[in-house]
């Protein structure tokens, strides 16, 4: 019963925290203006998919290869928009990282299933790495990031070896070099197994094949995860961290006391989690100096687990 409730929480996200606004995000994490650019990274039978780039102001200096982060929005693989992670993308661009918010196929618009979204996420990472020289990206410093269903997709780019699009150049790796995951869905096979088969968007063999926790290996990149302690999806996050640490890997878990799923979408937790993301990326030498983000007065603290 607990797992059924968990799935219902995930599936309902388009109506609540994970539904991105249809207008520009109101929260600004930096006063610094950044450059923007849209690039089509994939053409599918259901339409074009874009990467919405946010770059350090003044244009790219191609001689300088910068880290790049690709954000995937949440929405239960049903709905959502790249706009969800615009605040974080703008902030990281202001700090010198090239950031991109990715489109991917969702059921409400494209009538597709989660495995197609996995294909799209891997295609997005491959596009960035394959065009690294053109867009000024260091191909050894690519970060996959996302929230909820988007966190699941980001994790899949690092862990899932199946579900590569036929149009992809398989000689280009889709594996990112680091993960930033906001309450990701890491154990979807367990969730789907507790439901009636006709209620699941994919069959169980597909669910197993796109469950990140099934594929944690010594090659898993360093990861940081954010969860509210009241979020039942945290069970899967804890499982991932346990598996990664057992292999001697770096996997950080930061918990927001008594907070529900999607807590990071609103102030003050958006600022708090973004600052910790900055600290993590600085520790990997993807950023330099101190975080420039200002925390609201009396902002709460995350707990390291």
Stretch-by-stretch model annotation:
Residues 72-74, 128, 227-228:
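The conserved beta1-alpha1 loop
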Residues 63-75:
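Short beta-strand element of the alpha/beta-hydrolase
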Residues 81-82, 88, 102-139, 266-273:
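Catalytic nucleophile-loop/oxyanion-hole region of alpha/beta-hydrolase
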Residues 219, 224-228:
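Short beta-strand/loop motif that positions the catalytic acidic residue
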Residues 52, 226, 232, 238-305:
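C-terminal catalytic histidine-bearing segment of alpha/beta-hydrolase fold enzymes
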Residues 83, 123-197, 203, 207-208, ...:
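Primarily recognizes the serine-hydrolase "nucleophile elbow" in alpha/beta-hydrolase
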Residues 68, 91-103, 143, 178, ...:
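A fold-wide structural signal in alpha/beta-hydrolase
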Residues 19-64, 217:
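N-terminal cap/lid segment of alpha/beta-hydrolase-fold proteins
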């Amino acid at each position: 019963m607990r797992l059924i409730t968990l799935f219902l929480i995930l599936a309902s996200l388009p109506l609540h925290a994970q539904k991105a606004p249809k207008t520009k995000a109101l929260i600004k994490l930096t006063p610094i203006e950044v450059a923007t650019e849209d690039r089509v990274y994939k053409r599918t039978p259901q339409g074009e998919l874009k990467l919405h780039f946010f770059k350090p102001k003044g244009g790219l200096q191609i001689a300088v290869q910068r880290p790049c982060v690709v954000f995937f929005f949440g929405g239960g693989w049903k709905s959502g928009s790249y706009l969800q992670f615009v605040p974080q993308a703008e902030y990281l661009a202001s700090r010198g990282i090239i950031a991109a918010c990715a489109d991917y196929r969702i059921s409400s618009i494209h009538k597709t299933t989660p495995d197609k979204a996995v294909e799209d996420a891997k295609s997005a990472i491959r596009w960035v790495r394959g065009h690294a020289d053109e867009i000024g990206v260091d191909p050894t410093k690519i970060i996959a990031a996302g929230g909820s269903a988007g966190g699941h997709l980001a994790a899949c780019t690092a862990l899932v070896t199946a579900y590569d699009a036929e149009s992809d150049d398989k000689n280009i790796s889709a594996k990112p070099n680091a993960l930033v995951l906001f309450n990701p869905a890491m154990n979807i096979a367990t969730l789907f197994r507790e439901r009636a088969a006709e209620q699941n968007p994919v069959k169980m063999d597909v669910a197993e094949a796109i469950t990140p926790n099934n594929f944690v290996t010594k090659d898993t990149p360093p990861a940081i995860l954010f969860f509210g302690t009241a979020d039942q999806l945290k069970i899967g996050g804890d499982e991932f961290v346990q598996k990664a640490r057992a292999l001697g890997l770096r996997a950080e878990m930061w918990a927001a006391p008594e907070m529900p799923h999607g807590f990071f979408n609103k102030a003050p937790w958006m600022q708090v989690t973004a600052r910790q993301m900055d600290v993590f990326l600085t520790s990997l030498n993807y950023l330099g100096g101190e975080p420039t983000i200002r925390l609201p007065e009396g902002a709460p603290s995350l707990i390291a687990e």
